[in-house]
């Protein structure tokens, strides 16, 4: 059986903490990546985390987790502003070109370093 999908994993380092706290920017970037992949967005959910022990206005200064549920699978981002780090997944069923999403995230978040891994999922003999 051929692979059932392609899974892109991006680790972005050296990202501005302000960008990693901006849920609106992160959602629009996820949607732009979905569009670049030719994916159909079924649902979006983003959650802003508060900073432990902080009081307003810093209370929402923590990271963001966002997921786009796609007809083809999913896109997700998890951010750690205190470390300048974002972990991004793009999983597309079928023959994917998930690397098309990489440029979208790099342009929006301007990391100083990017680690990229691509895995073919499934593909068991049979």
Where are these regions (language model features)?
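Polybasic/polar functional segments that serve as interface/processing modules
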Residues: 1-126
């Amino acid at each position: 059986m051929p692979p059932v999908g392609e899974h892109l994993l991006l680790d972005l380092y050296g990202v501005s903490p302000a960008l990693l706290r901006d849920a609106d920017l992160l959602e629009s970037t996820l949607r732009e990546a979905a569009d670049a992949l030719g994916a159909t967005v079924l649902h979006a959910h983003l959650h802003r985390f508060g900073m432990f022990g902080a009081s307003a206005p810093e209370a929402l200064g923590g990271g963001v987790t966002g997921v786009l549920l796609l007809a083809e699978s999913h896109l997700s981002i998890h951010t750690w502003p205190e470390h300048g780090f974002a972990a991004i997944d793009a999983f597309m069923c079928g023959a994917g070109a998930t690397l098309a999403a990489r440029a979208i995230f790099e342009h929006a978040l301007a990391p100083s370093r990017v680690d990229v891994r691509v895995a073919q999922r499934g593909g068991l003999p049979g």
